[in-house]
A protein has these predicted regions:
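Glycine-rich, hydrophobic membrane-spanning regions of integral membrane proteins that mediate transport
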Residues: 1-246, 260-277
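Alpha-helical membrane-embedded segments
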Residues: 210, 250-257
Length: 277
């Protein structure tokens, strides 16, 4: 009986169409990318937390260099963004090919927009990485004048990274539900499959909120350095912060494009896997 069950189980696996096998392959890459993003979120959060604790006077002789966490987070986020870009462009090419063959009856513009926004994300984290490395080379955080406004800005930054984590978690849910959507076609026992459009849309909204907050933070840090710390801090510290402002502007553009795309996908009201971020 066990031998027959195994044969039947293998036969079911072979029934997965070539198109769905390609979709599952892309979803696997996307899942790995999101796990890398979530790991990067931990580094970003620790970076922000150490800064806040130092500003509040909780200093330790063995305090780690916060910029090491920032660099590690940027490296991981850059790797994840490259993987997501590969997934987004491959998914767009596949659906565009089907559109040319007359197999679909809806616009492929949202998929194209998501693919384009993925390039902005690569640029964003590349610029952030350059800024983080320059920060590591040049900055002694003890020279920054701590004011109540400075602490508020650091608290906002910490909240922004919490929102980022929730956004990545939402896309993790969307990706897992996309797996269920495909696997459910070959498993009759799964009758109630969730629509991945909803967590994807929530995640896209959270990313935009996070990036707006980080732009505000980077601008406030720049103003603080110029107005409050100009006489005590190396002027070269301002340069990495200019890069942070530029990167966050690019991030807002990318997240706005992808949010609009996910809104259009949600309006289709069709159960399809979610690709991109």
């Amino acid at each position: 009986m066990g031998h027959k069950y195994k044969k039947h189980h293998k036969a079911e696996k072979k029934n997965i169409s070539e198109k769905d096998q390609k979709i599952l392959y892309l979803l696997n890459i996307q899942l790995q990318a999101i796990m890398i993003y979530l790991t990067a979120d931990v580094f970003f959060y620790n970076f922000s937390l150490i800064l806040l604790e130092s500003a509040c006077g909780n200093k330790s002789e063995h305090k780690p260099n916060e910029n090491v966490f920032l660099i590690n987070g940027c490296v991981l986020a850059l790797i994840a963004s490259i993987l997501i870009s590969h997934v987004s462009f491959t998914a767009y090419e596949n659906i565009h090919f089907r559109d040319l063959n007359g197999e679909i009856d809806y616009s492929t513009n949202p998929e194209e927009s998501i693919a384009i926004s993925s390039l902005y994300l690569i640029l964003l984290f590349f610029i952030n990485l350059i800024g983080a490395i320059e920060l590591y080379k040049r900055v002694n955080i003890c020279t920054i004048k701590v004011t109540p406004q400075w602490i508020v800005v650091l608290k906002i930054q910490l909240q922004a990274y919490k929102i980022r984590f929730l956004g990545d978690y939402s896309f993790l849910i969307a990706t897992l539900e996309s797996f269920e959507l495909i696997n459910g076609k070959y498993d009759n026992s799964k009758s109630n499959v969730q629509n991945p459009d909803i967590p994807a849309l929530i995640g896209a909204c959270l990313y935009l909120v996070e990036r707006i907050l980080l732009l505000y933070v980077s601008y406030q840090v720049y103003s603080h350095l110029v107005n409050e710390c100009g006489d005590v801090i190396d002027s070269k510290y301002v340069e990495p912060n200019k890069l942070a402002i530029l990167a966050n502007i690019i991030g807002i553009i990318a997240n706005s494009i992808s949010l609009q795309a996910f809104i259009e996908i949600y309006k289709r009201n069709s159960d399809r896997p979610i690709f991109g971020r």
